């Protein structure tokens, strides 16, 4: 597959948001909703289940858009953005393995938040362990994920589900 590498820069991720990385595959969202600065590792055979591993990072600076509005005087990154980042990465993996279609989050089995991301943090790390990839008429990924801030685990998600669809008009 063209553009299949084991790591991606921010410029690559921005190209994905414009449909330029794999034109028939899923796109990442554009900023401000793009929730990572780089993907540092992609593997089809590693991870907790031997079905794929994705490692990605987001650099934290106090001027990130969400700190101004969530919450004024008590800034914290919304937990849903970390969850969305994990779905973004599962969708990216589906495109990386050749899946075609538009990516949509389909659900999550369980999410636990045990910490927070403050403007004083330096780096968020995302870790996605693929459990299953279905690449037939239905294209779907199932994964577990973790979000860490400055090395400390703060979110855990089980059974993240993302599907790829040729037509989303009736979704």
UniProtKB/Swiss-Prot annotation:
Keyword terms of this UniProt record: Cytoplasm, Fatty acid biosynthesis, Fatty acid metabolism, Isomerase, Lipid biosynthesis, Lipid metabolism, Lyase
GO cellular component, one term: cytoplasm
Subcellular location: Cytoplasm
Biological process annotations from GO: unsaturated fatty acid biosynthetic process
Active site: 70
InterPro entries in the cross-refs: FabA, FabA_FabZ, HotDog_dom_sf
Keyword Lyase attached: yes
Its EC number(s): 4.2.1.59, 5.3.3.14
Catalytic activities: a (3R)-hydroxyacyl-[ACP] = a (2E)-enoyl-[ACP] + H2O; (3R)-hydroxydecanoyl-[ACP] = (2E)-decenoyl-[ACP] + H2O; (2E)-decenoyl-[ACP] = (3Z)-decenoyl-[ACP]
Pathway this chain belongs to: Lipid metabolism; fatty acid biosynthesis
Role played: Necessary for the introduction of cis unsaturation into fatty acids. Catalyzes the dehydration of (3R)-3-hydroxydecanoyl-ACP to E-(2)-decenoyl-ACP and then its isomerization to Z-(3)-decenoyl-ACP. Can catalyze the dehydratase reaction for beta-hydroxyacyl-ACPs with saturated chain lengths up to 16:0, being most active on intermediate chain length.
NCBIfam families, alphabetized: fabA, PRK05174.1
Subunit details: Homodimer.
Protein name: 3-hydroxydecanoyl-[acyl-carrier-protein] dehydratase
Native source species: Vibrio campbellii (strain ATCC BAA-1116)
Native organism taxonomy: Bacteria, Pseudomonadati, Pseudomonadota, Gammaproteobacteria, Vibrionales
Gene transcribed to yield this protein: fabA
């Amino acid at each position: 597959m063209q553009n299949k590498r084991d790591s991606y820069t921010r410029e690559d991720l921005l190209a994905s948001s414009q449909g330029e990385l794999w034109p028939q595959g899923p796109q990442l969202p554009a900023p401000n909703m793009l929730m990572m600065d780089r993907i540092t590792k992609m593997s089809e055979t590693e991870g907790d289940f031997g079905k794929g591993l994705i490692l990605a990072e987001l650099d934290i600076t106090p001027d990130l858009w969400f700190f101004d509005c969530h919450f004024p005087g008590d800034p914290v990154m919304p937990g849903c953005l970390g969850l969305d980042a994990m779905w973004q990465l599962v969708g990216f993996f589906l495109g990386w393995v050749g899946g075609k279609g538009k990516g949509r989050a389909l659900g999550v089995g369980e999410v636990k938040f045990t910490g927070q991301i403050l403007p004083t943090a330096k780096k968020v790390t995302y870790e996605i362990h693929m459990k299953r990839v279905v690449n037939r008429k239905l294209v779907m990924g199932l994964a577990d994920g973790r979000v860490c801030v400055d090395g400390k685990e703060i979110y855990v998600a089980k059974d993240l589900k993302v599907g790829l669809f040729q037509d989303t008009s009736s979704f």
